[in-house]
């Protein structure tokens, strides 16, 4: 089983990943779009890449 050598090393890796701006952005409006029909019912197409 996997055992961590150092929690400080893990924390440094997490901090490095948290600063990554190339990942998922919640501001991306292209992930899903809501469409309304004439009755006001909504449909959404969710795309996972």
UniProtKB/Swiss-Prot annotation:
Record's keyword terms, sorted: DNA damage, DNA recombination, DNA repair, DNA replication, DNA-binding, Metal-binding, Zinc, Zinc-finger
Tell me the gene name: 32
UniProt key word Membrane:
no
Q: Which residues form a coiled coil?
A: none
State whether it acts alone or in a complex, and with which partners, per the record: Homodimer in the absence of DNA, monomer when binding DNA.
Instruction: Say what the protein does.
Output: Binds preferentially to single-stranded DNA and therefore, destabilizes double-stranded DNA. It is involved in DNA replication, repair and recombination. Binds ss-DNA as the replication fork advances and stimulates the replisome processivity and accuracy.
Q: What is this protein called?
A: Single-stranded DNA-binding protein
Misc. comment = Interacts with the polymerase and the uvsX and uvsY proteins.
């Amino acid at each position: 089983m996997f055992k961590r050598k150092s929690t400080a090393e893990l924390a440094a890796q997490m901090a490095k990943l948290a600063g990554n701006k190339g990942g998922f952005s919640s501001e991306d409006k292209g992930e899903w779009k809501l469409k309304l029909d004439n009755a006001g019912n909504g449909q959404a197409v969710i795309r996972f890449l």
